[in-house]
Amino acid sequence: MELNTISQSDFTRLATMRWLKSKASLSNIMRNSGLFKIEAVPANTGETREYSEIDLNEYASNKSEGDQAERASVQQGYRKTITAVRRAKDIGITVEMRKRNKAPEVIARLTNLGKLIDNRLDLDLTHVFTFGWDTSYTDMDGATVAATTGDTKALFYSAHLLVGADEGGSSTTYRNALANNPRLSKGSLEGIERLVAEETYNYHGELMAEMPFDVLWTGPDPNTVNTAQEYLKSTADPDGAHSGTFNGYASKYRHLIIPRLATTAAGARDTDKRYYWGIASTSNSTAHLGIWEKTFLLTPDELGKDSTESWNYGARGSYGWGVVSGSFVKGSKGDGSA
């Protein structure tokens, strides 16, 4: 690529191709995890979206001969409003880069630009779990982010109340934070599965006995990842003393490794969170992602040029996220804390 002779329009075409290729290379792990229900928000429809849960009875009622059938009871659950945020980043291709043919530096800048918005989205969605034991945190831009569910409690909590937004639900409480926060092991996995069996209710206080949990999520910690793989992929009981012992966990869950799970609000490493893990139900998720603006590229024709003679390119995107309730996910910090 001879930068010293290329026109701005030709360079923009090349920049767009490089940007799209870089963007397409991202795995978008959290967005594609199945844990978030994604909605494309139409333009000119406001900057907020409200989500809620509605539950029916789990069981039918008796109907005697000649009697009218009883109507199912509909219960409004909690509500959660998400608000759009706009993410942006610009780069400048300087006149020196163009005139002196610094192609590698230019390619590096364009490649980086293609990843910035989607990387921030992945971090924001990851921090739903990273800060799942907190009610709020301050992000890298200094903004306060509410980490609560619709009941104003942290996502992972010991006593979520099922009364609902209109307080017409049940006085039953449930927990989705595993007691004593054990590290991933056979015993702790069975403990968290007990939360599924005994602590998963609808807003009528009825046990949801058949809610399928299909994801085992962890961070990238090698020991935790390897432990998860041993349980999910062994053909025999990993803790069994005899060969040929059946492994009850084989193919029971899809293992979701979340690369940015053990991070600070600024995206730096946070070893205090390296052992976080849990399970989740994708089909019953109440986590929502609204996309107001898909990630797009701005060119010098749109951003303009300045007295530095730089050609300016920018990435933009807008989205919002939030969780209505914690019923679909169970978690442990893995640090042994009470």
Residue ranges and their predicted role:
Residues 57-63, 99-101, 306, 318:
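Short active-site-adjacent helix-start/loop capping segments
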Residues 2-8, 149-205, 209-214, 220-338:
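Sequence/fold signature of self-assembling virion shell proteins
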Residues 27-87:
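Assembly/oligomerization interface modules of large self-assembling protein complexes
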Residues 14-15, 53-59, 78-80, 174-183, ...:
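Generic detector of short, locally flexible boundary/turn motifs and exposed helical patches
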Residues 121-170:
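Glycine-rich, mobile lid/loop segments that gate access to catalytic sites or pores
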